[in-house]
Amino acid sequence: MYYSKLILVIIFITSLTACGNKEAKTKETTKTAEVQMPEFQNKGHELVYKMTQETGSYQDLLNLKDIVFHYTYRTPDQKEDVSIESYIFNGELSHGTYLKHERTLPNLKGKMQQGYNGKDFWVKIDGQEITDSSAIESVTFTRKTNFYWFSMMQKLLDPNINYEYLGQDTIKGKLYDIVKITFNTAGDAASDTYQLYINPETHLVDQFLFTVVSKNVTDPVLMRVKYENVEGILLPTYRKYTRSDWEANVLKDAWVEEITKDIKFNQNLDKALFNN
């Protein structure tokens, strides 16, 4: 009997020790997680980080490998580009098969494909490669822009980004935190500027202002977005933009629309698709 009780006591003490070790490990893990929190530049940086906790991070996109979706770009005159977009997130590989191209290289008649393989940009019409420098310049801009607009919210934590918190403002009865974004560029090259309007209730960017310095667009353009949840990632599947001022007032009620649908992640895309 004595030995039985002794064994029970030993088992009880062992279980307490195990629980204590488990608790210690839990505390240690929590502490490690706290240490791994980003070091924020300022409040603006922290707000952008909180936004990515809602939308998903770029690592979440990398985990999903790749994507295929149907994309429409429509200008106020109702002319459209309609394409099947395919991306591999690791390396930002990009490919577009155009069902219609009334805005992008409309002078090139026939079935158009564009691609970026991680090194080179290319374009083909009816299977024939086009090497004209102006066409390649157009494709370079389109491939980069299409990929960036799709993944922008996740990429706002990329390196070489500067954040500035500008305070709060009310737009159409909604309170927003405003964060200015600029980018570190090579040499003395001018940076695009983004001004995010972050909803403090949802932590999402409802709209933003942007410039496109490479196209000499230095006056702000206002972009408004609507999100869709696809496999746990919040994506801005409807976007529209128009001319604005730096107070986000619409200067011209004529909008360019961008519509993303039929989104499919993890399609096991072959990298050969992205080569010319």
Give residue spans per PLM region.
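N- or domain-start disorder-to-order transition segments that initiate the globular core
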Residues: 25-28
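Bacterial signal peptide processing site
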Residues: 20-22
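Flexible, processing/modification-adjacent segments and terminal tails
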Residues: 40-42, 118, 122-190, 212-215, ...
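C-terminal motif of bacterial Sec signal peptides marking the signal peptidase cleavage site
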Residues: 15-18
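Gly/Pro-enriched, hydrophobic low-complexity segments
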Residues: 175-274
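Short structured motifs
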Residues: 54, 162-167, 221-224
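N-terminal mature ectodomain segment of secretory-pathway/periplasmic proteins
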Residues: 32-33, 38-40, 45-129
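Bacterial N-terminal signal peptides that target proteins for export
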Residues: 1-7
